[in-house]
């Protein structure tokens, strides 16, 4: 499942962007995210009067010559953001639609690249059934990132996924130190809201990305059809349906899809999370440089 997006030209265009975290970070130093505290970087922030125990190397002697008082220079604190990308690997995300699978992997890779390019750390957490697989661990640096991507392009999309069970059972979600992204189509009867509640409880900034194929947004079926649940693949599954596609049924489907999107958006807004729904025929660059910039996720 090689993606046409994942090439040097694509990644070079991403180098002009950065992920934006709206909250202060706790955690590791060494990234490019400024927080409202003083630290060890070289970017000047302010002055204050010298106090016993301060580093005398920070005394500004020019100010001393003017005011005959000791002032020390304060510098901004930069910290490293922890970016966690939860990727729904259920069958509906790509078993029968390799283009949708490649798009999902490309979006995950783009967000991961932005993380390591800005000296942050990233992990790809694959949601399979009710568990999370973390095949690469924490990734820091582009060499490790590109090795992970070469493997990520070949992951298997199959069976079902329980987003809430997987995320809430994940042992390394961190706390108050970064961004959690959930990439899924959310075409499931299983609960997904507990996952968002759990991550916001952990004081994570949350981005929910819904990916839908054009056929899922506007199905081209007509006449009599036999719909088989892709996540079970079982022709005897009670969720399968025999339908006669009529105009009224098409309109009912589109209304149900609008209701689903509205429900996700409303819930995310109530929890302080961001929600973006994207059709997979939309160029990824337009989504990154358009939707995510507009939402303030990137800068």
Could you tell me what each predicted segment is?
Residues 53, 130, 158, 212-214, ...:
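Short, solvent-exposed coil/turn elements at secondary-structure transition points
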Residues 102, 157-164, 255-258:
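Conserved phosphate-coordination/catalytic loops
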């Amino acid at each position: 499942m090689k993606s046409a997006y994942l090439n040097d030209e694509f990644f070079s265009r991403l180098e002009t962007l950065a992920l934006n975290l709206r909250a202060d970070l706790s955690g590791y130093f060494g990234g490019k995210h400024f927080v409202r505290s003083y630290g060890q970087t070289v970017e000047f922030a302010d002055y204050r009067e010298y106090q016993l125990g301060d580093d005398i190397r920070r005394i500004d002697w020019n100010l001393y010559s003017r005011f005959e008082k000791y002032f020390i220079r304060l510098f901004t604190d930069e910290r490293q953001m922890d970016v966690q990308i939860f990727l729904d690997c259920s069958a509906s995300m790509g078993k029968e639609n390799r283009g949708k699978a490649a798009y999902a992997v490309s979006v995950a890779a783009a967000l991961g690249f932005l993380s390591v390019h800005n000296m942050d750390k990233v992990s790809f957490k694959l949601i399979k059934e009710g568990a999370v697989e973390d095949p690469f661990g924490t990734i820091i640096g582009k060499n490790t990132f590109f090795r992970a991507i070469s493997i990520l392009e070949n992951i298997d999309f199959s069976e079902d996924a329980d987003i809430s069970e997987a995320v809430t059972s994940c042992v390394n979600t961190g706390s108050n130190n970064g961004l959690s992204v959930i990439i899924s189509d959310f075409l499931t009867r299983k609960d997904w809201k507990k996952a968002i509640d759990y991550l916001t409880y952990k004081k994570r900034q949350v981005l929910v990305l819904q990916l839908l194929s054009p056929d899922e947004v506007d199905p081209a079926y007509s006449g009599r059809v036999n719909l088989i649940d892709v996540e079970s693949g079982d022709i005897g599954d009670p969720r399968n349906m025999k339908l006669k596609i009529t105009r009224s049924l098409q309109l009912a489907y589109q209304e149900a899809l609008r209701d689903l999107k509205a429900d996700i958006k409303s819930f995310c807004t109530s929890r302080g999370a961001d929600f973006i729904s994207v059709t997979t025929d939309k160029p990824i660059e337009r989504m990154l440089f358009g939707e995510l910039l507009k939402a303030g996720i990137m800068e």
